Amino acid sequence: MAAARPALTDSLSFCLAQLTAAAGEGPGGGKDPATNETPLGRALLALRTRHIKAAEGIERFRARGGLRPLLALLRRTAAAGPAPSQAASGSAPSSVASAGSTPGHAPAAESLLTPSLPMRLRKTLDLALSILANCCTEGACRAEVRRLGGILPLVTILQCVKTDSIQNRTARALGNLAMEPESCRDIHSAGAVPFLVESLTACQDSQCLQSIVRALRNLADSPQHRLALAQQGAVRPLAELLATAPDPALTAALVRALLELSRGCSRACAEQLSLGGALGPLVSLASHPKRAIREAAILILANLCAQGLVRPALGNAGGVEVLLGELRRRRSPGGSSSATQQPLVRAVCLLCREAINRARLRDAGGLELLMGLLQDPGASAWHPRVVAALVGFLYDTGALGKLQALGLVPLLARQLCGEAGEEEEEGIEAASWDFPEERTSGQAEGGSFRSLRLWLISEGYAAGPGDISPDWSPERCPMPEPSESVSPTPGQTSMSTPRTLRKPGRIPAATPEEPWGQEGPALLLLSRFSQAPDPSGALVTGPALCGLLAYVTGAPGPPNPRALRILARLTCNPACLEAFVRTYGAALLRAWLVLGVSPDDWPVPHARPVHRSQHRELGEMLLQNLTVQAESPFGVGALTHLLLSGSPEDRVACALTLPFICRKPTLWRRLLLDQGGLRLLLTALTQPAPHPLFLFFAADSLSCLQGLVSPTASPVPLPALPLELDSPPPCLYEPLLGPAPAPAPDLHFVLDSGLQLPAQRAASAAASPFFRALLSGSFAEAQMDLVPLRGLSPGAAWPVLHHLHGCRGCGAALGPVPPPGQPLLGSKAEEALEAAGRFLLPALEEELEEAVGRIHLSPRGGPESVGEVFRLGRPRLAAHCARWTLEPGQCPRKRALALTGLVEAAGEEAGPLTEALLAVVMGIES
């Protein structure tokens, strides 16, 4: 049997020839498609079903030049149509209406464009549009269609032919073309959006609606295009369809389109979504079983939060609970990455701007969620935004109490000096809708307003035209926080209201402006907490005080005055006095502000911004505030109770703090001296430190107390012993060492090394009871010319022999003393001191101790030598060490380092150190 003869339409060339002929571009062209529909229809059908769908068929069709006649065919049907104003309410560009067409073709075109198209012509147009839409799935074809001007015919067909199938394929072709940014721009310029919107409202076919929705989604490829779509009313029909769409496929397409249109949500987009009734359906879709629809709906709700006008309605629809639940799910251990949490965090923070949504958020556990974000180091980039959101709860007493219980205050204090991400700037549309603005157009600004604005700028009340709007009113402006009196001292002004940085060219304002930087929201919340009747539990703690002080001293410019007012408010509150004592807060204020030593600067100093005079003034003012509280009847009772009946830790803290905040002699003498506060503090030095700066605080406290006990004491440096004297005392032992000694020695002391040292028997016996008994008594050594001295090295024996022969101040006592930096334990100096005690030479002991003190405890000496000297265990040297440590005028850091060395040297034997320090403080040292 013979094989079947191949059809003509199996040939791509035949199909292209038919297409070219129908388009009027080849031999015999210009035939009316209505009279030539049968061969053309077969060719178009073959192109769509076989040639285009074959492997690389679209590329072959494009390479063989098929797009040009295809577009020409579409152009012929679209060019001679009625004016756009007659066909639709929208308007197409004039180029569409003026496209050229031959008079002979007009009747056919008119018949094509009638509302009831002939079946064959409609089928031809359907096939041609289907082929074009399929071809536009590839980038090369999209580029060529745009180059050949194929967008305008599609817009005209969309405008004029209202058949669902043709609208469907036209929208599909436009949607495919919109995948290229250049084509998307041309489609917008061609005026396709109004016709797509019109078709969206008129069409009933689900497939057609999906194609139109997809085209609108692809046209929303940039912020400018999204805004244009919203301004042309494309969002509301989508929202209305979402509220009534029964088709799951259409619902998915609508959600995807609305997600794209709501990115960077504009005011017009939010208004249309709300008016279209989409908020409720979106909240319902947030629990859809399909993940793609569910997540898209949630992201649309998150995007809508950028517009304040829609947030109250969004909360009424249940959006607050949906967003909180999704953010909680994504932050769970099995949740998603932080990048997917960002839009939800932003949305939840924006929801805190309206009171009604804050109430819903609080009831739905949103405060705990926000606190979890603040406690998460991995979410540090969002911390400024979260803190700014919590400012909305500033006057919600219940929420503030919960936030305080959850540990907000230490997190805020850490926020003041931490390196966190910057808060993203929001537009004016994101402002709270609790006080909606009456929008005034620029054209409506009257001359009176312009005159007012110019006057405000000239007087310095506004920096520029943008600082004040026509909608400004005194009711909308928050009153500045009053600068309350913080201290009766006259030195409070400069730090309580520091100068603000002035921008170049800025006219000084009549009232100083408070800087509002990244720390502004945190300080506002801390200020609110400080206004509580008893804020000590939250703010008078180590972390809170450290955060405030780190901000005040570390700010590159003048700190925010609110931080200074917080500190002043706390120190003026009697309810905070005990907390300042228990937490070493007063000592911290003095160390950080007055002395310039922070916890990070101890024991190794670190470079940081220095404004010492202003900081010192602030510290003295705050301590004066605490002094006023401490010396009041309430303060006296509180301190007495704390010292006598408090816990051991509180008693030590009270004893340490009293010299800083008590100036009345009757008070500090009774508490520290009569009731044992000083001895309690000294005993605690050798116990585990309750604070990282405890020894620094203790050294400073003892020095202050010494100044209170002896207020007229002034630094009296010890006279340095010159190593080379201009007229040294004569050495009485040196004549015995020459080749011709005079007088001649009558005995020699023999050391363990065999060295023989000459001596006079009578002088040695007269200088020491030990040698008197040894050399003049009944011992065998009294009859010997070579007397052994066991356990004595030459270096240690040298000052002994000099002293036995009457040398005083000849420099021999300095010989065994090592230079600073070398240990004294095990040195010749220690051996000489032991020998002086063994040989009953107290004057030599004193001379050696004085030599050690003058070399290692000179005014220019280092604190590391103090502990070395104390380790020798000599009472006089211990007193010398205590005197050097607490010497008036001593550097605070050196004093603290010296006390640290003394504590380490004392070990568990605290008695000698306690007695030495007590004697120096009380001024009773011998």
From Swiss-Prot:
GO terms for cellular component: chromatin; Cul3-RING ubiquitin ligase complex; cytoplasm; cytosol; focal adhesion; membrane; nucleoplasm. One of its GO terms (biological process) is T cell proliferation. Substrate-recognition component of the BCR(ARMC5) E3 ubiquitin ligase complex, at least composed of CUL3, ARMC5 and RBX1. Residues 745-813 form the BTB domain. Its main location: nucleus. ARM repeats lie at residues 139-179, 181-221, 223-263, 267-306, 307-354, 355-399, 401-440. Pathway: Protein modification; protein ubiquitination. It comes from Mus musculus. Keywords: Chromosome, Cytoplasm, Nucleus, Phosphoprotein, Repeat, Ubl conjugation, Ubl conjugation pathway. Substrate-recognition component of a BCR (BTB-CUL3-RBX1) E3 ubiquitin ligase complex that terminates RNA polymerase II (Pol II) transcription in the promoter-proximal region of genes. The BCR(ARMC5) complex provides a quality checkpoint during transcription elongation by driving premature transcription termination of transcripts that are unfavorably configured for transcriptional elongation: the BCR(ARMC5) complex acts by mediating ubiquitination of Pol II subunit POLR2A phosphorylated at 'Ser-5' of the C-terminal domain (CTD), leading to POLR2A degradation. The lineage of its organism: Eukaryota, Metazoa, Chordata, Craniata, Vertebrata. The keyword Chloroplast does not apply. Induction: In CD4(+) T-cells, mRNA expression is induced 2h after CD3E plus CD28 stimulation, then subsides and remains low between 24 and 72h post-activation. It comes from the Eukaryota. It is found in: Nucleus; Chromosome; Cytoplasm. One of its GO terms (molecular function) is ubiquitin-like ligase-substrate adaptor activity. The gene is Armc5. The modification Phosphoserine is found at residue 337. Ubiquitinated by a BCR (BTB-CUL3-RBX1) E3 ubiquitin ligase complex, leading to its degradation. Deubiquitinated by USP7. This is Armadillo repeat-containing protein 5. Residues 82-104 have a biased composition (Low complexity). Residues 82-111, 472-516 are annotated as: Disordered.
